[in-house]
Amino acid sequence: MDSKEMTLDQKEGSGEIRSRFDVLETLSSIRKFLPFFGFLIILGFFAITTGGAILTPKNITLILSGGYMLMIAACGVWMIMTMGCLDFSQGSMLGVSCAVFCFFSQYNLIFAIVAGIIAGGLIGLINALIHVKGQIQSFVVTMCTMFLLRGVCALITTESPVYAASYVTKLNNMPLLMGITIAVLLVTFITTRFTALGHNLKAIGANEKAARFAGIKVQKTKIAVYVVAGCITGFAAFINAVKVGSVTSTAGNMLETQLLIAMVLGGMPINGGARARFSNVVVGVLSYLVLQKGLVMMGFTTEVQQLILGLVFIAMVALFSDRGTNQVIK
């Protein structure tokens, strides 16, 4: 009799555990789609508050045209964040890379693009070596290089802005820039989805020690990703030059903040890991662009916009942070 009762109790206990697991699994599945629903809510909200003005072809074009550089740079940042790391030097890196591109554009376009990419890659390499070899947290390293590079950018543009060659701004047409952006997105998606790189990034983000024990070359992977992300930002500098035509001391200012907000709007867990998805990039950047444009159209001042974006950022970090692990930013 006792054994039967124990069996029944065990069945009830296992059933309760299974029920809780099913609930957690359902909540996890719902959370996957929250960023997409969030984008639709943001779009719907501003469609109502602006009387549909935000959905006019002109404003849609303006939203998209302002997002090419951000979308491209976000690809590299996504890879870094998937490892549980951060890069606060993106804006300053873009400014320096853009200055390099503008200077060499006076001689040859292809050479200028390559020079900008190399400049970004070298900065990424410096960040990676200090972070990995010096065993210093990534956000500390990149905050230092952010200020350093901002100073370099200011020195370069002290007397006057660095202008790109006149033909560069003639490349500013929507089909070309959209095609380039889609190409970068596809290459990044395919590389991280169908090669070992994507698995390694998530493994490092989830548990760096376990990844090392599993045979993943953590240090080499981190260095490679920071270099690649730097190269991507260097290429984004070319897009920035096409849009603006010159570089000033404020080039790329606050880009790192925009990228971070975009990532969390897309559902990116701030500590990376297995829950990072490439859709974080596309949904996040589009959500940020619509949110920013909508706030401008509603007539909010810059200060109020920053306040709202800050509140949204805190809410998204709280929602998508993985509290089930003890991982911190590396």
For each of these PLM feature ranges, what is it?
Residues 133-134, 138-195, 223-224, 243-249, ...:
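Transmembrane helix-bundle core of multi-pass membrane transporters
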Residues 233, 247-307:
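Transmembrane alpha-helical segments in multi-pass inner-membrane proteins
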Residues 41-50, 55-106, 131, 263-275, ...:
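Single transmembrane alpha-helix segments in multi-pass membrane proteins
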